């Protein structure tokens, strides 16, 4: 508050839209046990599931923060930076990595954004005067700085 106006940009992913972890839908698992969020992770760690959950948590954080600081000059929003040409694929499990490597090698140049392009939405949320002028808080943005509906679970 002392340095207001302030911005909080929570970087998420389109994986935040995956319903696994919220509803016990058979193809997506058994859902999150909110009394012990680590219960299923201890028995069977699934990186994709945990990544999606963490990205949904980023959206929930920005939304909750925006509500808590409503009326103050603090602007909290979240965004998906887009498919960016980074080294994220190095963390993909071995059984999927061959397919992923093949995809990225063949389509990287035209399907993925450069890191500079991928940073544009975050830079917009962190620096654009429009955020304050239009009182934009608790919103979800997609590349390139397009406001869209957040995941329905957020």
Regions found by a protein language model. Give the residues of each.
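Short, Lys/Arg-enriched charge-dense amphipathic segments
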Residues: 89, 96-104, 154
């Amino acid at each position: 508050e002392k340095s207001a106006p302030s911005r909080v940009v929570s970087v998420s992913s389109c994986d935040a839209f995956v319903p696994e972890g919220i509803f016990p839908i058979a193809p997506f698992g058994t859902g999150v046990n909110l009394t012990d969020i680590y219960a299923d992770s201890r028995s069977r760690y699934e990186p994709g599931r945990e990544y999606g959950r963490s990205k949904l948590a980023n959206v929930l954080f920005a939304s909750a923060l925006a509500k808590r600081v409503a009326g103050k000059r603090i602007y909290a929003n979240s965004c998906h930076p887009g498919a960016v040409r980074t080294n994220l694929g190095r963390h993909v499990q071995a059984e999927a990595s061959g397919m992923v490597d093949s995809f990225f090698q063949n389509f990287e140049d035209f399907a993925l954004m450069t890191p500079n392009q991928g940073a544009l939405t975050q830079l917009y949320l962190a620096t654009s005067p429009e955020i304050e002028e239009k009182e934009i808080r608790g919103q979800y943005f997609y590349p390139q700085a397009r406001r869209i509906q957040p995941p329905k679970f957020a």
